[in-house]
Amino acid sequence: MSLSNESALMDSLNPDHPPLIETPAPRVWKFWGTALWGIAIFAAMFVGQIGAIVYLVWVARDPIDLASLQHVGGEPASLAFSVTMGLPATLAAVWLAIRIKKASFVDYLALYWPSWKQLLFGAVGLILIVVAWETMSRSLGREATPGFMTDLLKSGRDKDAALMLLFAFSVAAPMSEEVLARGFLYRGWSASFLRVPGAIILSSLLWTVVHLQYDLYFLAEVFSIGLWFGYMRYRSNSLWLTIVLHALNNLTAVVLTMWLGS
């Protein structure tokens, strides 16, 4: 045995001089890989939602055409089912993308539970943002909630679909959107040339695009909330934190609109 090999062996047995171990680079999709997979994941979410409506049309034995899809999809219970079915489709696509990289699903998405201090800080910041937009809306004489959402939620309440809508908008939608935006997109883009600030801004912009059913005013509000969620994702290294914040925001909006006012 050579002196160098003998020295290395002695170091490996010495607790004061542990052997040097190279840490493998994390297996992460970078900018373009994350972007392309992001499109695929969004498409999977869309297919899951549309597939749910097609299934309901088929069960009702209606012709599977645009008119039937619009008619069935306009019902509150059907829409709630559609939004809910987007979640498993999203999770499956994200799991596949991460699996190909042979990375840990939990580590890749930072599925770690935050501390109560982080949860409180995130909630207080979210409340301040929402209250600021609410105050601005009232000063401008604007509605605090888009009219079509108010009509949908109240219709769901009257048609006994309140709990389905509550689950869809307060659980399924926040999980789907956060796994895509602050989970998969943020993780890959923050490890690319965009770094953390660019990843927060770009993922927030794309999350805003998902809400194009709103007007520019409400889109600006969505974008500002997205920036806060992105910052909290970075600050806490916890996707569960942004999922909970997103769920609380939607839950409050749904309950206030559906039962306590317009």
Which positions does each model-derived feature cover?
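Hydrophobic alpha-helical transmembrane segments
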Residues: 35-39, 80, 119-124, 163-167, ...
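Alpha-helical membrane-protein architecture signal
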Residues: 28, 32, 116, 160-168, ...
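Functionally important transmembrane alpha-helices
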Residues: 48, 54, 197-212, 216-262
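N-terminal, membrane-interfacial amphipathic/helix-forming hydrophobic leader that caps
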Residues: 1-108, 251-262
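Hydrophobic core segments of transmembrane alpha-helices in multi-pass, intramembrane catalytic enzymes
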Residues: 86-89, 165-168, 221-229
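Solvent-exposed interhelical
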Residues: 187-200
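Juxtamembrane helix-loop-helix connectors linking adjacent transmembrane helices
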Residues: 57-80, 102-173, 191, 262
